[in-house]
Amino acid sequence: MIEQVLHYWYYVLPAFIIFHWIVSAIHTNSLRRKLGAKPFTHTQLDGFYGFKFGRDFLKAKRIGRQVDLINSRFPDDIDTFSSYTFGNHVIFTRDPENIKALLATQFNDFSLGGRIKFFKPLLGYGIFTLDGEGWKHSRAMLRPQFAREQLPMSPSLEPHFNVKAYPQEQRWVFDIQELFFRFTVDSATEFLFGESVNSLKSASIGCDEETELEERKKFAEAFNKAQEYISTRVALQQLYWFVNNSEFKECNEIVHKFTNYYVQKALDATPEELEKQSGYVFLYELVKQTRDPNVLRDHHSISLLAGRDTTAGLLSFAVFELARNPHIWAKLREDVESQFGLGEESRIEEITFESLKRCEYLKAVMNETLRLHPSVPRNARFALKDTTLPRGGGPDGKDPILVRKMSCSIFISGTQIDPKHYGKDAKLFRPERWFESSTRNLGWAYLPFNGGPRICLGQQFALTEAGYILVRLAQSFDTLELKPDTEYLTKISHLTMCLFGAFVKMD
């Protein structure tokens, strides 16, 4: 009996698969004709349904080379291709026209897909994880908190720029990214919660020791570790549920406990106390809009991620590039000297949002850093319906392609080093390019802070904070040097940060 059943399925199952493939192909061709699309110009097969590429990506992720791996899949003449990753059909693109469609002109055709499932254990429900009305409500709630009048200024930032924290002996080589992490978490927690965690006041970096809550000591490590797990969940796509071990859960609990401490403190404050609060406090303003502790916690976890990691990454790579290009560092110091003075003649009180905008070379340095090391090197969208993207089909890749409820991987990092947009020296750190006519109309070929309706609310906050620190470093130090034999900084995958730190000498 069993042999008869097996014999039956031996013929039926292959026949069903072939029949399904034929029907699917006919339907796909019909949709292409209906929507005016063409077959993909380029298709890359990476083992059985992309499991080989998925394995290679996870291996590259461990050594900080995942951005390089994806870049290697884009020869100069290919901007869009079809492939598979862990069984999921994915469109990879760095074409500005496709990116514009995904993020703006066809915004309603696409969603974040599985992001909520990947991110929820750490970040909950918020502006980074929600679609539709939930996202609109979250964005409307957060938008006023990043108004120009709330941007960080000298009085709020200077206490966190503790020059004593920067080893100043030539023989000292230290990880400046660690200091930038501490600076950004200090300034972010003061902005968000009304009080800084004062992580720069740590005996381990030569400053005054201070007693801290146990949660404060554990928070940064737990936050970093949880993000590593999140990035692996994203890489695994539909297999994300494999990554849910006890360490991941413990890290999430530590982060939530840290945030809940401040949320409860704000909820316990009376309306009169909230009104009398001196200075602007992000959390206290949100408490006026909602009393839901989970909503408050999720918004603050997401804001802390954005406020800490992206700015620290921008500063770390800016210093890395300046340290290996002494002539650019010298030119930046000249720009800073003309605007704010150097050394003992520094005019710190004059560093404002408006005055930083006048430092043209400083802006060029930050633009170039974000071009080569964008804070979010890759992004993704999922098609909500059968639709098209403008390019990637036909004999030359210029015709529309059909997108059938599938994932689209947006590779901003690849776009921003493409010679078609930035010339033959696209991979070279050269701030002067931002004074040339070729960079005046880049459009969707330069997206350091995303684009379309989801453009980053905190971009001016990040640029002001990073600009302030670069000015203060230029005022305080004559030279920057890299750790010997440092030619490349490995990167983590979820945001552009240095996997093993950024080691420099300063004098």
Swiss-Prot record:
<dbReference type="GO" id="GO:0020037">
    <property type="term" value="F:heme binding"/>
</dbReference>
<keyword id="KW-0349">Heme</keyword>
<keyword id="KW-0503">Monooxygenase</keyword>
<keyword id="KW-0472">Membrane</keyword>
<dbReference type="InterPro" id="IPR002974">
    <property type="entry name" value="Cyt_P450_E_CYP52_ascomycetes"/>
</dbReference>
<dbReference type="InterPro" id="IPR036396">
    <property type="entry name" value="Cyt_P450_sf"/>
</dbReference>
<keyword id="KW-1133">Transmembrane helix</keyword>
<dbReference type="InterPro" id="IPR047146">
    <property type="entry name" value="Cyt_P450_E_CYP52_fungi"/>
</dbReference>
<dbReference type="InterPro" id="IPR002402">
    <property type="entry name" value="Cyt_P450_E_grp-II"/>
</dbReference>
<keyword id="KW-0812">Transmembrane</keyword>
<keyword id="KW-0408">Iron</keyword>
<keyword id="KW-0479">Metal-binding</keyword>
<protein>
    <recommendedName>
        <fullName>Cytochrome P450 52A7</fullName>
        <ecNumber>1.14.14.-</ecNumber>
    </recommendedName>
</protein>
<keyword id="KW-0560">Oxidoreductase</keyword>
<dbReference type="InterPro" id="IPR001128">
    <property type="entry name" value="Cyt_P450"/>
</dbReference>
<comment type="function">
    <text>Together with an NADPH cytochrome P450 the enzyme system catalyzes the terminal hydroxylation as the first step in the assimilation of alkanes and fatty acids. Preferentially hydroxylates lauric acid.</text>
</comment>
<feature type="binding site" description="axial binding residue">
    <location>
        <position position="456"/>
    </location>
    <ligand>
        <name>heme</name>
    </ligand>
</feature>
<feature type="transmembrane region" description="Helical">
    <location>
        <begin position="6"/>
        <end position="26"/>
    </location>
</feature>
<dbReference type="GO" id="GO:0016020">
    <property type="term" value="C:membrane"/>
</dbReference>
<comment type="similarity">
    <text>Belongs to the cytochrome P450 family.</text>
</comment>
<dbReference type="GO" id="GO:0016712">
    <property type="term" value="F:oxidoreductase activity, acting on paired donors, with incorporation or reduction of molecular oxygen, reduced flavin or flavoprotein as one donor, and incorporation of one atom of oxygen"/>
</dbReference>
<dbReference type="GO" id="GO:0005506">
    <property type="term" value="F:iron ion binding"/>
</dbReference>
<dbReference type="Pfam" id="PF00067">
    <property type="entry name" value="p450"/>
</dbReference>
<dbReference type="InterPro" id="IPR017972">
    <property type="entry name" value="Cyt_P450_CS"/>
</dbReference>
